[in-house]
A protein has these predicted regions:
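Short, histidine-centered active-site or binding-site loop motifs used for metal coordination
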Residues: 1-3, 48-49, 84
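Short, surface-exposed ligand-recognition loops at beta-strand->loop->(often short) alpha-helix junctions
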Residues: 2-12
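Residue-level signal for secondary-structure boundary sites
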Residues: 7-9, 52, 88
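An amphipathic, aromatic/His-enriched active-site/gating alpha helix that lines ligand/cofactor pockets
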Residues: 17-29, 47-81
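A short beta-turn/loop motif at secondary-structure boundaries
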Residues: 33-38
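Short, low-order "capping/linker" segments at domain edges
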Residues: 83-93
Length: 93
C-alpha cells in the first residue's frame, strides 16, 4: 500500500498495533515492511488459517477502527495477491 508523503511511519505503527488481536483471529504470520527505494510504500504479508478467518478479522471493531484511522494517510493505491502456501520456514504445518 502507498501512503501519502510523510505518513509511512504512522501507518506502520497502526499496522503493528493489533498483533495480538490478529493472532486470536486466526492469523499465523503477519509481517510489515518498508522500502528504502520507495519511502511511501508499505508491504504487509499475511498468512491466515483460512479466507474466512481473514474476512472475519475485518469485521472486528478494533480492525475497523484501525482502518478508519489509516485511510486518510493512504493514497488509495493497493496491490494484493492471494497464494496457496506450499510450506516454508516460519509457516505453520
Amino acid at each position: 500500500m502507498r501512503t501519502k508523503p510523510g505518513h509511512r511511519d504512522d501507518v506502520v505503527a497502526l499496522l503493528l498495533g493489533g498483533e495480538d488481536g490478529l493472532r486470536a483471529a486466526g492469523c499465523d504470520l503477519y509481517v510489515v515492511g518498508t522500502s528504502a527505494d520507495e519511502p511511501d510504500l508499505v508491504w504487509v504479508y499475511e498468512v491466515w488459517l483460512s479466507e474466512e478467518h481473514h474476512a472475519a478479522s475485518l469485521e472486528l471493531p478494533e480492525t475497523k477502527a484501525a482502518i478508519a484511522k489509516a485511510m486518510p494517510m493512504l493514497t488509495g493505491e493497493f496491490t494484493g495477491q492471494q497464494l496457496d502456501i506450499a510450506g516454508g520456514l516460519g509457516v505453520p504445518r
